[in-house]
């Protein structure tokens, strides 16, 4: 079974997008970008079980020779990922708050996202682009939050929650993630 690509997706030579039958159905289920292109994936990548949750104005760019395993990419604005980046199982990269922070607005937004919405527009979300530079490694179950830049060659330990920029060749761990050494 092959995965059908949205028409506004560009994929480089030799790239494989795979998953079991359950994950194949999820890969582009929440891909709503109206940009053209809304997703660019470089050459020689292997993305297994990755879920693209991309809003109408969202854009995701992935460089060459990347390896992602069951990662979640959530973009209302922009996620840029460089070359030779590895992202481990169940890691989440998100460029926005999932919902507004104020309780009344959050409830309105949850309804807008539900089948009850009947086409209602979502409220504006606080968004800032995420950039992951070349040769970075993002461990399993790590979370990269909006506005963060992961420097070239940085190493994000499994389970880390990254809320601020990580300098190049720096190793981070924890919630919130903090530097524990260099690579």
Q: Where are these predicted regions, by residue range?
A:
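Conserved sequence/active-site signature of Rossmann-fold short-chain dehydrogenase/reductase
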Residues: 161
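Binuclear metal-ion centers of metallo-dependent hydrolases, dominated by the metallo-beta-lactamase
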Residues: 156
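Domain-scale signature associated with acetyltransferase and cell-envelope carbohydrate enzymes
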Residues: 1-135, 140-147, 152, 168, ...
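Short helix N-cap motif at coil->helix boundaries in the Bergerat
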Residues: 164
């Amino acid at each position: 079974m092959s995965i059908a690509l949205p028409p506004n997706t560009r994929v480089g030579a030799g790239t494989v997008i795979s998953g079991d039958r359950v994950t194949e159905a999820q890969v582009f289920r929440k891909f709503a970008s109206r940009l053209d292109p809304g997703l660019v994936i470089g050459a020689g990548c292997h993305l297994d079980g990755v879920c693209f949750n991309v809003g109408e104005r969202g854009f995701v760019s992935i460089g060459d020779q990347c390896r992602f395993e069951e990662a979640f990419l959530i973009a209302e604005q922009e996620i840029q990922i460089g070359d030779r980046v590895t992202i481990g199982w169940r890691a989440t990269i998100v460029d926005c708050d999932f919902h507004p922070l104020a309780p009344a607005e959050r409830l309105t937004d949850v309804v807008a996202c539900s089948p009850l919405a009947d086409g209602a527009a979502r409220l504006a979300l606080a968004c800032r682009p995420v950039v992951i530079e070349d040769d970075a490694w993002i461990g399993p179950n790590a979370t990269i939050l909006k506005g963060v830049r992961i420097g070239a060659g940085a190493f994000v330990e499994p389970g880390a929650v990254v809320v601020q920029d990580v300098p190049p060749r720096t190793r981070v761990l924890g919630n919130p993630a903090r530097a524990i050494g260099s690579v």
